[in-house]
Amino acid sequence: MKKLIIISAICIICGISTAQVPVSLKAAVDTALKNNLLVKNEQLKAQYQQMLIKTATVLPKTNIMADAGQINSIYTDTKFGVTQNFSLPRVYTSQKELLQQEWKSSVLSVAVKEALLKKQVAQLFYTMVYVEQKKQLLQYLDSLYTAFYKKASLRLEKGESNLLEKVSAETQLGQINMQLQQLQQDAAVLQIQFQLLLNSTTLFVPKPQPVKMELTATADTTKLKDHATIQLIQQQEQIALASIAVEKSKLLPDLLAGYSNTSIKGTGADNKIYGSGKRFNAIQIGISIPLFAKAQKEKINSAKFSRQIAEHNYTAGLQNIQSEYAAAVAQYNKYKQTVQYFETAALKNASVIISTANQQLANGNINYLEWVQLINQSLIVKSDYTEAIKNLNESIIQLNYFNNQ
């Protein structure tokens, strides 16, 4: 898999034609959730923990004994026996509860990994969209300077201008081409990362769609408790409680049950003579009491401390995610206002500047240096708008992550 992805990346960087498959964000996320190896690994861990639940009732090995010799008298007798130790039902119940809570924790770990994967896929997806927008902006700028370069070359041939115009245009075109090459390399790196997340050798690229995301969920801090990360932290408290119950159950006595079969040769109490063919049966019942339980009680106390740690981790984790959520909301509002400013005023002004500058240059009302300043000013506005869209999308992706979307 890695070799194929590396080969694909080399093809991209070197400009070799490879088939690209447009994909929507939803389809990309679905593919990643299905194929991503880290998610699969967490799912396997969950299956492993689920299978362990069946091991809650594990009995000690059965003891089978055989004796032969002068057991009861001068005669040689034989004795066969079997014993089995086991705990009270409460022990097995508490062990099963602990294993079930650990399994629930592993299931929540899958949810945490999936939520993070959705966020990573969305971030890469819209970063690739951003790079494509930057590429289109540079290509537009390249077309402007290419047209001017041709005019400057023609003016130089006719003696209507000096060499400065042509050299300046060549310099601008060279810088644009260098930036385009850098963008191509950035796109190749993003392609590699995207394929790794989706665990696919297919060259998936973002499907044409609006470059600006829309926030669908409203801000609601009460839902943060339902976030997979917080649920996972909270689950550690349930594991700690189950661990306390398991340690307490170890103070309960263990039971023993046995059965033996023996021969008693010679004259019995009833004055009858018995040979080896006559067998005598007996049952055995015992109990194991933890007389020296100080160490086990210390284990119980340490398990209680583990619960306190889990409680503090939950409180700290909830406070942390609430703080991050508030920061994300503030970032979203800031970038939303910035984008609105560009869309309502700055972009329109930039377009007017470009068209007016081209017209005035053609009419001879401004010189080349003035035209360059005006064009660069307007394109800085367009570039800043692209950056603002990128920042807005990132803030929305972060909020969607907190909202389990």
Each language-model region and where it sits:
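Bacterial Sec-pathway N-terminal export signals of envelope proteins
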Residues: 19-63, 86, 94, 160-164, ...
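Acidic, low-complexity, intrinsically disordered peripheral segments
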Residues: 6-7, 29, 384-405
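Sec-dependent N-terminal signal peptides
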Residues: 4-13
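Transmembrane beta-barrel architecture of outer-membrane proteins
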Residues: 77, 123, 168, 234, ...
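Outer-membrane beta-barrel "beta-signal"
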Residues: 79-83, 281-291, 387-389, 398, ...
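Amphipathic alpha-helical coiled-coil segments
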Residues: 41-53, 113, 117-136, 154, ...
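Periplasmic alpha-helical coiled-coil/stalk elements that build and connect Gram-negative outer-membrane
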Residues: 116-231, 238, 328-331, 335
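Small/polar (Gly/Ser/Thr/Ala-rich) solvent-exposed segments
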Residues: 40, 59-77, 85-112, 132, ...
